[in-house]
Amino acid sequence: MIKDITIGQFFPGNSVIHRLDPRIKFTLTFAAIVFVFVANSAVAITLMTLAVFSVIALTRIPVKLYFKGLKPILVIILITSLLNIFYIRTGNILWNWKFITITDQGLMRSALIAVRIAVMILISCILTYTTSPTDLTDAIERLMKPLKIIRVPVHEIAMMMTIALRFVPTLLEETDKITSAQKARGADLESGSLMQRVRAMIPILIPLFVSAFRRAYELAMAMECRCYHGGEGRTRMKQLHLSSRDFATLAFGAILFCGVILCNQIPPSL
């Protein structure tokens, strides 16, 4: 399951989504995640889902990679959906047995939550799959630039956020390797009581922490060897400029979000 986590990876390409200004992509990604939770009708959430899959098609990245990124959260989606099914008692009763009651509102709410979580992950994957670490850092730094007035270290914050995001797949891959190595040595990680399983994780966590600190040290040394000293005086080989394509994308996003608000008024509400 660990190797199925793909969020944080970058897949180079030349699609229209890859060529968008990273500031536009970051802004629309944040807004889209917000509007996924704003959508509270079947029509609104369907509109958001169709828009997300349309963008996925435009990225020219295999769809299976996006669905691969959903595998690790299937358990979370399932548990959340079941909780909503069994704990929501409003609406028409569809099935009742002792203390278990399933209603139509519970089913609709659980479906809405499941779709929301899945679409949110897909939106995040679109951003990381189509935006290089350098572009993502520049986008975050530019968007946070007004905070420099109150002496917030914008560049350093943007750099830390990007490094943390990009280290996710690296650490997950390292975890998978360590787990496989421990299993090859006879470690049993899947049986026993809860405390036994927790203790069995210690031989995995200690090497993982050592590896993480080693990679952090190597990265720090590499940045120091390249004379990196923060954002002050830093120049950029690639300057960000908004094009007509970016403004058109921004307008499309605004129309989509307005459509979601309007669709919320269409019954039935979830």
Protein language model features and the residues they cover:
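Transmembrane alpha-helix interface motif
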Residues: 1-42, 48-57, 142-145, 149-152, ...
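Membrane-helix interfacial "entry" motifs
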Residues: 14, 37, 60-65, 97, ...
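Alpha-helical transmembrane segments and their helix-start/interface "positive-inside/aromatic belt" motifs
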Residues: 25, 64-74, 246-249
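Transmembrane helix-loop junctions in multipass membrane proteins, especially transporters and channels
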Residues: 41, 45, 60-64, 88-96, ...
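Alpha-helical transmembrane segments and their membrane-interface exit regions
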Residues: 51-61, 75-79
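Juxtamembrane/interface alpha-helical elements of multi-pass membrane proteins
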Residues: 73-187
